[in-house]
Amino acid sequence: MSHHRRDSGGDVVHVIPTNNPPPDNWFPNLGDSAVWATEDDYNRAWAMNPDNTSGDNNGPPNKKTRGSPSSSSATTTSAASNRTKAIGKMFFKTKLCCKFRAGTCPYITNCNFAHTVEELRRPPPNWQEIVAAHEEERSGGMGTPTVSVVEIPREEFQIPSLVSSTAESGRSFKGRHCKKFYTEEGCPYGESCTFLHDEASRNRESVAISLGPGGYGSGGGGGSGGGSVGGGGSSSNVVVLGGGGGSGSGSGIQILKPSNWKTRICNKWEITGYCPFGAKCHFAHGAAELHRFGGGLVEEEGKDGVSPNPDTKQTVQNPKGLSDTTTLLSPGVPHNADASYHTGVALQRASSAVTQKPGIRTHQKWKGPAKISRIYGDWIDDIE
């Protein structure tokens, strides 16, 4: 009977043979499934003794784990690894390789299992006790401290942001200045505007020139009659050029509107009855807010377009003795030699034509083609 002794202080399992060794012609029963290696045996052999493989990447690679232990822990791990290799050598070629019988063994001569019966070795009789003691030692039952891999926490760095704390940098500029921001009404979008709002450019001193009628001039030394130029007061920086009786009595800076301020009806207000810009809208919300081009409210007109101010009309008696009156045409209106055409137009628009004053743009209602077919249809009557 053989006696086996395990040296606890070393890293090698010593098997002491007795005087009665097993016979050399030991042939196991090939029909016994315990003689053939299983898939678990292959995995266990790889884990215990990976050096005997051919290194063809069929087994798991021998990688170094992240956060490897210190030198003392590495020594303990190395000792446990040596014991594992010793046990693996104890079971070297103690089973037949089933992959070699199938012709698919990748390890060839480096296989841990026997490819022939002649290579087969008998395991020690007490191999179960040796394996159990090794497993108990690995689990920490015999006082050997288990090696616990402590993962070192990774230090995280926050990438600094280049965005400044000002409100200007919060907007995504498109590289252009906001046009509405520099007007007197200001930008209706405020901080949500995607264009640049430059306060320094807005506060720069500039001279505003308005071309319009007289009545809008304001200045410290402006006179009455003709165009008024504001230049008497030191604080005035508005120059108004216009024609008309303007009385300059203001002493401060006059806020001027654009020349096309509220000269048209707001489409949004006219269709929906609501405008998001409100009083800051550049278009008129109703006929009461409608202005002339250059400034000034438009005078209310009647249903037929007659101006309520009677002194704006100049009438003369018809030279042919007709009872109706005709108005003097404006200098820019061409005259036609056809008397019937003039008579028809004069009878139909006697009250709508207004003499044009300097600096005032008149608004007249166009009533469509009035008997325009007679111009092209008279020649038919002449032929007949």
Curated annotation (Swiss-Prot):
Q: Polar residues bias: where?
A: 50-60, 309-329
Q: Where is the composition biased (Gly residues)?
A: 212-231
Q: Name one Pfam family in it.
A: zf-CCCH
Keyword set for this entry? DNA-binding, Metal-binding, Repeat, Zinc, Zinc-finger
Q: Which GO terms describe its biological process?
A: regulation of DNA-templated transcription
**Single annotated GO MF:** zinc ion binding
Chain positions of all zinc fingers (C3H1-type):
91-118, 172-200, 260-288
**Low complexity composition bias: residue spans:** 70-81
Where are the annotated segments for Disordered?
1-32, 46-81, 211-231, 299-335
Q: Which Gene3D superfamilies match?
A: Zinc finger, CCCH-type
Give the protein name, as stated in the record: Zinc finger CCCH domain-containing protein 12
